[in-house]
């Protein structure tokens, strides 16, 4: 698959999802996974997760020539990720980076029937993915560059997002349309405390399509509003149309050409 044939490059976060299967239980969440007990589970389902695989494989299934650019470690989990990609098309793993000094990112998805899902996540090699890992020569000739989940990639949000802005600027200068997908950072972690307003101000001038969810954008730009939300209620149900317009307008003012605010089951708020 040569660079001349590629239409879309999808880069950023990728991980191995390990999903144990559970039998229905009569006990509730309070009795589940009690310390010192053994819980019998069924076979584990393995799949790739993150935007590199989710978006990239969806485009591939639609027949769009796509190159995937993510980073894994030289370990068993990394080989599993590569093999899962190769199962769709042997060429899909060609753009992946294998770093012998890093471990592969993985998530354990604990999802018993009738109990809210719990995720155990190790960022692994995603934390060291940087602008230099994207060879602009391998991007040139494509029409779209899609980057996903900088809040889950340490090099992308440290130093006020200098590496994220550098990456998007280089790709934009190469003549590609750019899109940026976000993820929800834990508010109590380094990612959640990062100066996202500053990061977006530096990055969005090089982004054509910006795709955050409503709760992600509130956390990043209006922390007081975010902290005042009622837990357990859909965020979109607590925010009126005026607030959506205000948030979208602020993002457009930072430089993005199009903003698509994801509203869960309420759909998408799109503004140019």
Residue ranges and their predicted role:
Residues 66, 92, 178-179, 211:
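Hydrophobic beta-strand scaffold residues
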Residues 9-10, 143-148, 179, 211, ...:
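Structural motif
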């Amino acid at each position: 698959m040569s660079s001349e044939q590629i239409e879309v490059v999808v880069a950023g976060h990728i991980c191995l999802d390990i999903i144990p299967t559970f039998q229905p239980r009569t006990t509730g969440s309070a009795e589940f996974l009690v310390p010192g007990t053994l819980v019998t589970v069924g076979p584990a389902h393995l799949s790739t997760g993150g935007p590199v695989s989710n978006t990239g494989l969806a485009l591939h299934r639609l027949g769009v020539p796509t190159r995937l650019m993510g980073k894994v470690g030289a370990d068993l989990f990394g080989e599993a990720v590569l093999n899962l990609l190769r199962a769709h098309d042997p060429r899909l793993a060609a753009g992946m980076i294998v770093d012998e000094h890093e471990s592969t990112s993985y998530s354990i998805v604990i999802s018993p029937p009738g109990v809210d899902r719990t995720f155990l996540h190790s960022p692994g090699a995603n934390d060291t993915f940087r602008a230099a890992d994207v060879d602009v020569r391998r991007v040139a000739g494509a029409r779209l560059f899609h980057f996903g989940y900088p809040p889950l990639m340490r090099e992308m949000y440290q130093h006020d997002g200098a590496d994220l802005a550098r990456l998007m600027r280089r790709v934009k200068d190469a003549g590609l349309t750019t899109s940026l997908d976000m993820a929800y950072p834990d508010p109590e972690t380094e990612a959640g405390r990062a100066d996202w307003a500053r990061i977006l101000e530096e990055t969005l001038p090089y982004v054509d399509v910006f795709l955050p969810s409503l709760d992600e954008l509130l956390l990043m730009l209006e922390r007081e509003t975010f902290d005042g939300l009622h837990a357990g209620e859909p965020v979109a149900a607590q925010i009126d149309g005026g607030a959506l317009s205000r948030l979208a307008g602020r993002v457009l003012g930072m430089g993005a050409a199009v903003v698509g605010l994801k509203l869960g089951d309420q759909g998408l708020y799109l503004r140019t």
